[in-house]
Amino acid sequence: MNKFVSQSTIDTFFDGEHADPFSVLGMHETSNGIEVRVLLPDAEKVFVLSKETKNVLCELLRVDERGFFAGVVPNTHSFFAYQLEVYWGNEAQVIEDPYAFHPMINELDNWLLAEGSHKRPYEILGAHFTECDNVAGVNFRLWAPNAKRVSVVGDFNYWDGRRHPMRFHQSSGIWELFLPKVSLGQLYKFELLDCHNQLRLKADPYAFSSQLRPDTASQIGALPEIVSMTEKRRKANQADQPISIYEVHLGSWRRNLENNFWLDYDQIAEELIPYVKDMGFTHIELLPLSEFPFDGSWGYQPIGLYSPTSRFGTAEGFKRLVNKAHKAGINVILDWVPGHFPSDTHGLVAFDGTALYEHADPKEGYHQDWNTLIYNYGRHEVKNYLASNALYWMERFGLDGIRVDAVASMIYRDYSREDGQWIPNQYGGRENLEAIEFLKQTNHLLGTEIPGVVSIAEESTSFAGVTHPPYEGGLGFHFKWNMGWMNDTLSYMKKDPIYRQHHHSQMTFGMVYQYSENFILPLSHDEVVHGKCSLLGKMPGDAWQKFANLRAYYGYMWGYPGKKLLFMGNEFAQGREWNYQESLDWYLLDEFHGGGWHKAIQDYVRDLNHIYQKNAPLFELDTDPQGFEWLVVDDYQNSVFVFERRSKKDERIIVVSNFTPVLRQNYRFGVNIAGEYLEILNSDAQQYMGSNSTNTSKIVTEDIESHNKAQSISIDIPPLATVYLKLHKVKKVRKMRKTSKVEDTAVKTEKKIAKGKTTRTKKTVADTVSEATEVKPKKTVTKRAVVKKVKNEESAVFPNAEVIAESTSVENNVS
């Protein structure tokens, strides 16, 4: 029996059960004098050195053969700085004693973390490079309030949980240990003795880097430097700006042609950014990049929320990709998944033996559709963990926004559940009040800490006020995916044109609720997987009709109010469904493989985007009813739709769509403004592999009443096509002795335009939200093309979108 520490106490260390290592290990003042006690399994000898003089002060006694050493430092009556000289066989090593260092978490951080109100807990928890008493090392911290013992294990201690048990802060439930001389890139985990005396090996929830699957360790990485938001990036996110989003899965956009392996972040950036810029997209939206164990989840089942996936390289590489996008004038949005997490044992499930991050009751905590677990939003520490993660991605990588996945599954307790499978809220309702409050708090946090960051909801129900400010009962998002519009219009487009007349309202119904929220029109990855066919595959008819239908649909979509989102591959009409394990079918753009069809639709989408960006009527008043008017809404027999878009300066663009394969010659419809109109886009143009039924000359209004308008125009509407007509020149209308109210209104509007006056737009929902936040393949059968590819591009009607946009300036300050 030794005179230093009881054998039973020593046994608890080697049994991995001691909960308070600092009460035993390190330097202690005792009746014997100043004692030093160390736990060094497999060591043979240990000497105490003066840190100042490097002299040996004493040799510690090996009081337990398993590696527990203790001894009294002679002639010493106060604490001093020391090091340990350790002999491992014939090798000697001078080391710092981790148990010689004081606690490093301050009282304020400890209190805020306990309260769950720390804005940036990732700056405290996890693994951080720091200095303590002029010694460099890594400070490890973990929240596990119900664990009996926690140790940090890794490359640096042979993954032995006995060697480095951590200090416990009772008030916050946080465990802490400073380890000197631990270096960047080393692997680590936390070993927990849970409340049921079971050992659990967990990855760090706050790790900045993680191993590539199937390995599961965390990796010591530096906290990325802050990237400031710029005014240019902030402006590009506003509701009155053109927003055309290219949705990308980095693992399958392009792959290495030789081995079908992923490209890294830098290789992707070299190809993706110039492509997106050339195609005219304003934003890139990336499918989730937080580390995830299962490739087939596409990132939507993350475990390492703070770790950019190592599939494509390092966090620094990802940061360079984002920076390259910004230099090209492209904003970057990240899909973010705070709704659920997988049940992999190294993750958050039963973290300390209790349902720490999830609900204990599966009626609340288990997502049966995805076999995942649902976060407990009623727990402050969990909300803090999630909300700060959104801030981390925006602030530390310079991202410009988040798209929150599966919001409906978060805000409804009965989501995808039968009666008896869910628990009502405190008022007996189906709403998840805690999740709703979490979303409000997260949007508020982002808005106050990084004004200008955009927050987008994928919300598939009619929950009211998603993009309204919290003080109006809203969730505080800036935009919401318009799933209703997408489902209705795709349902319409899939029908044979002969039947479309019976479903006319599917293309118009969206306007009934258009201004209830700020909408994004999404043609996302979800629409081209799981047997749903590609977008091209959804279109009816032969090959020519399929492409014509898709071009007409895109034109209708780009003209319709709402920001745009298109999943990769749809810009060139990939024929098969998306496969996350393979690259997109880029070979279709070759003349030999694609016959020019796919290249033509790629050119069309490029022109659409550039025309969209350069014409304010197509985007400026997306959230204001004054920016839109139906001109022909009820011609179901011909499946024709005509509407007008307007800008803040009252510029006008008329969008005309014909969803039958019949040429509508001399089709007359009424317009608001008398004058000359130019055709600036025609999806049936020869260069897009259309039939080339175009309106090449100026289109002049006539004093013929039509559709309750005094003025009208007559044009040829191509088959299965969309046409854009831009007001080019205003014509003065001679006043008759007797005029209708419609004519009076038209004349007044023309006078305003002629004088350069602008319409006064009311405050949009997006403006209000901005203020508030300051606080699833079928084979495509290709038939013989009806129209041959144009060999001589000079004979095409529209050389390119930029020339079109520049050559259609409106006289008299109209454009």
Curated annotation (Swiss-Prot):
Enzyme kind, highest EC tier: transferase
Listed name of the protein: 1,4-alpha-glucan branching enzyme GlgB
CDD domains membership: AmyAc_Glg_BE (cd11322), E_set_GBE_prok_N (cd02855)
One GO CC annotation: cytosol
HAMAP family in the record: GlgB
Pathway: Glycan biosynthesis; glycogen biosynthesis
Catalytic activity: Transfers a segment of a (1->4)-alpha-D-glucan chain to a primary hydroxy group in a similar glucan chain
Keyword Chloroplast part of the UniProt annotation: no
Key words, A-Z: Carbohydrate metabolism, Glycogen biosynthesis, Glycogen metabolism, Glycosyltransferase, Transferase
UniProt entry tagged with the keyword Isomerase: no
Gene source species: Histophilus somni (strain 2336)
